[in-house]
């Protein structure tokens, strides 16, 4: 008997402790974590500077409404602002960040349509869900919000056809579709989207899963020299303390005048204290190490797994990697066998094993994970 809604497919054990990149359950089992709490714990479970900052803030002030100045918000916003090119709005989650982005877009572009891509994922609240072009996510919730249009990801021809047919004001997308199957954006699609921006279409980049160092850059769009009009963050921003952020170019700041949007808990002192330490930690040296480990891990997985009959492809960027299986029915079985052997991983799409290890994981542990995957597959 549970008093909880059963909207999650929970596994039959509890995780009770975390250390660095390891998790421990209530039965005494130890797991090497290749999930990071679904891309949240980028600095692992023992990020001491973050813990110290949160504990100190808890002793000082745990909540402050947005009726007053908040220097901690200013500190974090400055670190995210790309040399003061963007203004920040803080909230509590990824879907809230995307809702803020969509509201701002509506104020700027009025009744023009927003284009989103099939298999993208932007959240489960109504606006974000309307932009999430996955039938399994939208099923049962019609009518969704109007003025959203779908097009296949990485399909330049389809994009051009949509632009000819519809009055598109903005495009929302991920650099790597995470929930959709760890599918990276293609170079020709990058150029097509930049061309859209040059024609006055807003680019909204969802960095909820790819941001905060996951791909070897602070933001994944930096790999492709994008300058998004709007981008969104959450998950790893405060390393386990719930927070989200929507950032927009300075020229759009006036659209969110007083009272146009808000959040009771957004940018609260505990989250900002943690986020401030996270952003201090993820400097250029740290990101170089993530890039190096990502290259090492992807090469290792390719060498060990590409010859397997069960593996169709291996793809990713930095420490965000997907292993596509030839038989989608094998995904739950592989995940279960990995758990039994002390490794936690995720699924994505319908046929992909998704690996999101903490960015602090060592090459020794990455190799251990690769060897176990080789054995299981």
UniProtKB/Swiss-Prot annotation:
Residues bearing the modification N6-(pyridoxal phosphate)lysine? 235
One annotated Gene Ontology cellular component of this protein:
cytoplasm
- Superkingdom of the organism of origin: Bacteria
Q: Which family does it belong to?
A: Belongs to the class-III pyridoxal-phosphate-dependent aminotransferase family. ArgD subfamily.
In Gene Ontology terms, what is one molecular function of this protein? Answer: N2-acetyl-L-ornithine:2-oxoglutarate 5-aminotransferase activity
- The EC number(s) given in the record are 2.6.1.11
User: Hey, what's the signal peptide range on this chain?
Assistant: none
Recorded hits in CDD domains, A to Z, give: OAT_like
Taxonomic lineage from the root: Bacteria, Bacillati, Bacillota, Bacilli, Lactobacillales
Q: Print the miscellaneous field.
A: May also have succinyldiaminopimelate aminotransferase activity, thus carrying out the corresponding step in lysine biosynthesis.
Subunit annotation: Homodimer.
- Cofactor list: pyridoxal 5'-phosphate
| The UniProt record lists the keyword Plastid | no
Q: Which residues bind pyridoxal 5'-phosphate?
A: 94-95, 121, 206-209, 264
What keywords sit in the KW lines? Amino-acid biosynthesis, Aminotransferase, Arginine biosynthesis, Cytoplasm, Pyridoxal phosphate, Transferase
Main localisation, per the record? Answer: cytoplasm
> What SUPFAM superfamilies is this protein classified in?
PLP-dependent transferases
Kindly list the biological process annotations in GO that this record carries: L-arginine biosynthetic process
Subcellular location as annotated: Cytoplasm
Pathway this chain belongs to: Amino-acid biosynthesis; L-arginine biosynthesis; N(2)-acetyl-L-ornithine from L-glutamate: step 4/4
Recite the UniProt cofactor note for this protein.
Binds 1 pyridoxal phosphate per subunit.
Q: What gene is this protein a product of?
A: argD
The name of this protein is Acetylornithine aminotransferase
